[in-house]
Swiss-Prot record:
Originating gene: glmU
Binding of Mg(2+), residues: 108, 232
Reaction equations catalysed: alpha-D-glucosamine 1-phosphate + acetyl-CoA = N-acetyl-alpha-D-glucosamine 1-phosphate + CoA + H(+); N-acetyl-alpha-D-glucosamine 1-phosphate + UTP + H(+) = UDP-N-acetyl-alpha-D-glucosamine + diphosphate
Pathway(s) the chain acts in: Nucleotide-sugar biosynthesis; UDP-N-acetyl-alpha-D-glucosamine biosynthesis; N-acetyl-alpha-D-glucosamine 1-phosphate from alpha-D-glucosamine 6-phosphate (route II): step 2/2; Nucleotide-sugar biosynthesis; UDP-N-acetyl-alpha-D-glucosamine biosynthesis; UDP-N-acetyl-alpha-D-glucosamine from N-acetyl-alpha-D-glucosamine 1-phosphate: step 1/1; Bacterial outer membrane biogenesis; LPS lipid A biosynthesis
Disulphide bridges, residue numbers: none
Annotated protein name in UniProt: Bifunctional protein GlmU
Amino acid sequence: MTEQTRPLDVVILAAGQGTRMNSALPKVLHPVAGRPMVAWAVKAARDLGARKIVVVTGHGAEQVEAAVQQPGVAFARQERQLGTGDAFLSGASALTEGGADILVLYGDTPLLRPDTLRELVASHREQGSAMTVLTGELPDATGYGRIVRGEGGAVERIVEQKDASDAEKAIGEFNSGVYVFDERAPELARRIGNDNKAGEYYLTDLLGLYRAGGATVRAFRLSDPDEVLGANDRAGLTQLEATLQRRINEGHLKAGVSISLPGTVLIEDTVEIGRDVVIEPGALLRGQTRIAGGAVIGAYSVITDSVIHERAVIKAHSVLEQAEVGAGSDVGPFARLRPGSVLGEGVHIGNFVETKNARLDAGVKAGHLAYLGDVEIGAETNVGAGTIVANFDGLNKHQSKVGAGVFIGSNTTLIAPRVVGDAAFIAGGSAIHDDVPEGAMAVARGKQRNIEGWARRYWAAPERREKLAKKLPWLAGWLSRTQG
């Protein structure tokens, strides 16, 4: 086995509580750009082709394990928070095969690029190191452990912030907490002591143990120290979110997506977008959303777990969840497609139209103020303004079916379950409580009756008339003028 073909195991330390988050959610489960922070570390490990990935959990262990449970990921519990050395030993106990380099990552540093980690591992192997420390340089490295070098620039030790002298605190080179070890690390880690101010077992002490045995310890310096930024509080979380979102948006721009005002647009990492898509300011694209080429996403639209086909237009302020929009269709503005909504090609959904568990075939038009729930609507049907599919009886939802080429007049209510045949007409204002045959005209409304003088008698009642002058002066005058 050569240096370059030796397997790589990854241990991800994710046991901390994160008290400064002031949250019931474990720190590493706070989402950044669509993934929990710890899931970014798991993704990076997978991208490296790791043989085995072990996530060390502690606080909120069951929640963390449920969030990143997947094939190839194992878990180890750190029962007591005794420091990074103890956490590493917990994780190493699950590495039973041996013969691998071991990469240590943290569950709260989602900005680390897989390419950086790939270069780190390659450097470790090419230089024949027993331990390689990923370091960075900052004008003020407060909060980080410092890298103390000796003659010739060799890495001599890592000093934690709380144990550092004033001279050591002035050092700008910091320890990122990311390491590559050879296969001896678990055995050496058992010799780590806790003779420090915190009484903890520091993983950094492995450096001294390796050096004491004559092994080579080297550093690999980051070109961009922001890659190892973590989040200890909500402010740090927003900084991570902004950095990752900028990366994601820049990636889409390079891939041929037009994004107006990228700083206002949120696109989660799991979203896929085709070429020549236009995304207007304020859009939020989430989950497993897929957007095909040539589509337009209007300003302030929110799209989650949905499929948008070629040339579809989602107009401003529309909300889509678990929906599918066919090629060339347009939705909105101010429309809502709820789960189970499937629009065929060339469908028009206008302002203030809501759909749920609804299938609309090619060319259907619902232009204004409609609710279409639990319904199938055939091709080229026109749904008038104010149409409601009354699908709920107080206990159960009921399914309706409307054929192709149907004309539904404004302010119609379909009282489910109903079937409307192809090419039927429904007169405006109808409440349809029976099925409508193919080609028929359905009219279901009461005959208009005008009751002369009713308004005058209504407003002239003593309990109303005395309030008219103050609240409705024009009406009070009309009442006076029309009384005989």
